[in-house]
Amino acid sequence: MSNRLSYWEYLHQELKLNADIQSQLVVLDLFAGCGGFSLGFKAAGFQTIGYEMLADAAATYTRNLQDPCYCQTLEIGQDLCNHPDVIIGGPPCQPFSVGGLQKGPRDSRDGLPIFIDAIARYQPEIAIFENVRGMLYKNRQYLEKIVAELERLNYRVDIKLINAVNYGVPQKRERLFVVAYQTAWNWPEAETLAIPYTAGDAIYDTASTIPIGAKFLTPSMLEYIGRYEAKSKCVKPRDIYLDIPCRTLTCRNLSGATSDMLRLLLPDGRRRRLTVREAARLQSFPDWFELVGSENSQFNQIGNAVPPLLAKAIAKSVKMTLENKPSRPTDYFSPFPQQLKLPFA
């Protein structure tokens, strides 16, 4: 990728949707959210079908991708889609995130059994899910069970921590990706960037302004944040610095008045929260992408999404694999060669 393109130019070039170049390859997106993962696949030429339980997110998906997104609470055994080539998704990550207390499989929000059930019933060529990096550590035993179950279904499995900043996203966002495949898989190569895109590249036109309805941090908020940062031994305030990529966007630090909320330092010394559009740009949603719902709902949709630029890089690897499928499976080495033989549930 050339840095001669501005971030905006690159974003709109990569995520342009062209109905004339859609292939016959169908992607089923479970726990689809507002469609960040699907947007990357749609931009790579796939047809997409989404399922999402939250009405605002499902409406956002349909409005922008113009492919169906069914607003339903998913259940095991549910009829979804005939013969998808690929299944993707972001099963709720709260069971494995620090913010969600890392309860793992004991958490009723765990959507992975539903995701695995869909793979077992529809047998796609490739299935990919994204989750927080905490799943690889505190909940590693559960991850091993998932890998073992996928291998029992005759899939090969590969796992990788991927940082979105290496794929053109102006944000340091590390997430776990798990790929189940039948014949072959190659991870997308990181973009060759002389300098990663920065927060300033994404929001330079608004960062020093006071937009209508701007929400400023109150003195009590600033005092609370100051105590938190002192206790955490922060070297410098955790503002958004325009000359480097932004830190990870989450539902918590976008919508909540919390100690680690994302905020901008204005020239007059005041601090304000990000706007929805600024957050969307930092997550690599183009400006034509319209979100539905209240401000809090829109922030949550953005914080939960797979960055579309990263999603497209993955989609291109999937498409290359499906279009150049080898005649025989490649050599396979399990990521957990001595997995615990525990039942998956």
UniProtKB/Swiss-Prot annotation:
Q: Which GO terms describe its molecular function?
A: DNA (cytosine-5-)-methyltransferase activity; DNA binding
The entry's family comment says: Belongs to the class I-like SAM-binding methyltransferase superfamily. C5-methyltransferase family.
Pfam families tied to this protein: DNA_methylase
Which keywords label this protein? DNA-binding, Methyltransferase, Restriction system, S-adenosyl-L-methionine, Transferase
Q: Which residues form a coiled coil?
A: none
Classification via InterPro entries: C5-Methyltransferase (IPR050390), C5_DNA_meth_AS (IPR018117), C5_MeTfrase (IPR001525), SAM-dependent_MTases_sf (IPR029063)
The gene name reads aplIM
Q: List the active site.
A: C93
Q: Ranges for the SAM-dependent MTase C5-type domain?
A: 25-325
Q: What are its E.C. numbers?
A: 2.1.1.37
Q: What is this protein called?
A: Type II methyltransferase M.AplI
Q: According to its UniProt record, which reaction does this protein catalyse?
A: a 2'-deoxycytidine in DNA + S-adenosyl-L-methionine = a 5-methyl-2'-deoxycytidine in DNA + S-adenosyl-L-homocysteine + H(+)
Could you tell me which PROSITE patterns the record lists for this protein? C5_MTASE_1 (PS00094), SAM_MT_C5 (PS51679)
Biological process annotations from GO? DNA restriction-modification system; methylation; negative regulation of gene expression via chromosomal CpG island methylation
